[in-house]
């Protein structure tokens, strides 16, 4: 087999066999296929695409290229949840304890964040003492004893994906649907869960800017999951507006805790009920309607908060921070003022996320330091009435030299109009093996 022939085959729009894809991924991971040939192949995929069988073969080959987590030591059906990311997306901190409170095991390995704010692991490390690196035996033991553990993921999962993503990043081949789908799903399959729930964001703060793109990605990933023997469901959700009331790290953890107590914002609460409900459905706990009711009940009866509390305590976190949210670190606050009277008509969510990163809440490079106290509180969101000079957001930072630029960027990222805009739904659709159901 020669890499030249596989590049030529894909250039002509022909489908590769699973054997050819396995050979290519193994060879590239081992350093036997040079970057320039893999880059040529990736560009051919951008122009000619891949069908579901090819994408599944590529996903499985990448999953097998590194360590595959064996979760058989954890009792019950394990459901993994993945979000394609956005601004204010603290859903794992809420939906995972909700699902665990309803009796399903949640063994979740999450990443650190590159970009707007920290990932789930960075957010959890805002709680002093919380251990995100656990030996496998302890991770399993905690899940078997209390039903949930959230830790950092091994760098050894889907080794080929890491290498291929770095190449895509510098060769303008990031935005290919089969390459995006195989990258996400290779890590999910390597993480060892029995079923997978995907939260595919659509909008100005999402990787997929419109619903049609998001639906195509969701359908492809569900197809891969099902072909790989994992029951898979995707929700297509709105990221034209930041989720919840905050973007940052400690500030998002505090908001997640309030939500677990039943005191959170309506959009975050509603989305987490749907995410936890679908996790329960995938774990075969009942009909979807019953599972959604169970998820909602875990917030009203306090069991979801108790489950989060148990997990933090068990993993060495200081639970006094959960009992008294004012303990979380804070930074000096600076308001962003409305430039005129009217209604907040639109938010450029990606630019708002970039503003949070400018304040110190995110990182551009792996080694960058995140300030847990930095972030943004959204006082007004799309559809809200505003008065000139009224604060529409609060910026929190220890970098006073960045404030003026951050205020200017935030003001430039929102549009105020005379007419109140129509409110877009939070959830657009649910995608399963049976097809797309509008929500």
Question: Where do the protein language model's features map onto the residues?
Answer:
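Active-site-proximal beta-alpha loop/turn segments in soluble metabolic enzymes
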Residues: 42-45, 123, 161-170, 199-208, ...
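Active-site cofactor/substrate anionic-group-binding motifs, chiefly glycine-
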Residues: 49-110, 114
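N-terminal glycine-rich anion-binding loops that anchor highly charged ligand groups
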Residues: 1, 10-73
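Short glycine/serine/threonine-rich phosphate/pyrophosphate-binding segments
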Residues: 87-95, 100-101, 108-109, 115-118, ...
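Alpha-helix C-terminal capping segments
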Residues: 47, 93-107, 187-192, 227-228, ...
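Well-ordered secondary-structure scaffolds
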Residues: 5, 10, 15-18, 28, ...
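A glycine-rich helix N-cap at a beta->alpha junction
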Residues: 123-149, 219-225, 229
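Phosphate/diphosphate-binding glycine-rich loops and adjacent basic-rich segments that engage nucleotide
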Residues: 144-193
